[in-house]
Amino acid sequence: MAKRIVLFLLTNLAITFVLGIVLNIIFQVTGIQGGSTGGILVMSLVFGFAGSLISLFMSKSMALRSVGAEVIQQPRNHAEQWLFDTVQRQSQQANIPMPDIAIYHSADVNAFATGATKNNSLVAVSTGLLDNMTEDEAEAVVAHEIAHIANGDMVTMTLLQGVLNTFVIFLSRIISTAASSGKDENGNATQNTLVFWIVDIALQMIFGVIATMIAMWFSRYREYRADAGSAQLVGKEKMIAALQRLQHVHEPQEMQGSLAAFMINGARSKELFMSHPPLEKRIEALRNL
């Protein structure tokens, strides 16, 4: 299963890309082009933040569907009761409303937190995590997710993504307008619509990749903060033990999401595109607290 924090980003990019095309049509119909930089900026802000906000408010339901999880309404067994009690206790310690809780069936040792606000959040853990970790280790993982919620990481990621979206749309629009503009033999301003669309779409894709790299850097930074938050709630030794456990189990594929859903376990890939820092760096940071 490979679909968590970057699921938020992919959804956001898809929505922003579609909205960017809609924006192109609006500009063509209204005649707003490169001569109205202010108008382009305003429209870019509106459409840029629309993509990230839609992704944010869809994040909880998308996360549940993507892993086939159901919210625990009433604990039915020891594992559910333990998770319920742990989340309840830690959310009280962190001074946040108790999140919804879910367990999903997966061999991956993983957990994630998501939701639009602290009042509408979710903590979900895999059966693989519950089966392969001690209660102390699992407690630290849950605390890590609670820290994400307490830190407001989903909202913060949304604001960052909105700014990035705005620049992606704005810069693509400005450059594509300049590249497609010219003058006819009479000196009248002209624009090659085909060139405009090709350049604009290509630039949105290129700038979108750069924006994703920035978002991934920010996600890695927030992971360190969530680790520190877990250490405050349950002690750094438990969090270190949980990360060391992850080093000895099969790591799942890189999560392709804020949705931030912010999962505990990111896979190894080139660090620029990693949503999580390497485990050894996280352990070192905890030891230095």
Swiss-Prot record:
Keyword entries, A-Z:
Cell inner membrane, Cell membrane, Hydrolase, Membrane, Metal-binding, Metalloprotease, Protease, Transmembrane, Transmembrane helix, Zinc
- Gene encoding the protein: htpX
Q: Name one GO molecular function term.
A: metalloendopeptidase activity
Q: How does it sit in the membrane?
A: Multi-pass membrane protein
Specify whether Nucleotide-binding is a keyword of the entry.
no
- What family classification does the UniProt entry report for this protein? Belongs to the peptidase M48B family.
Q: Is Signal there in the keyword field?
A: no
Residues where Zn(2+) binds = 144, 148, 223
Where is the protein situated, by its record's location annotation? Cell inner membrane
InterPro entries, A to Z: HtpX_protease, Pept_M48_protease_HtpX, Peptidase_M48
The entry's free-text remark on the cofactor is: Binds 1 zinc ion per subunit.
The portions of this protein that span the membrane are 7-27, 38-58, 155-175, 194-214
Q: Which residues form a coiled coil?
A: none
According to its UniProt entry, this protein's organism is Actinobacillus pleuropneumoniae serotype 5b (strain L20)
- Gene Ontology cellular-component annotations: plasma membrane
Q: Which CDD domains match?
A: M48B_HtpX_like
Q: A Pfam family in this protein?
A: Peptidase_M48
Identification of the protein by name: Protease HtpX
Give an example GO biological process.
proteolysis
The UniProt entry annotates the active site at 145
Chief localisation class: membrane
Q: What is its EC number?
A: 3.4.24.-
Which cofactor(s) are needed, names only? Zn(2+)
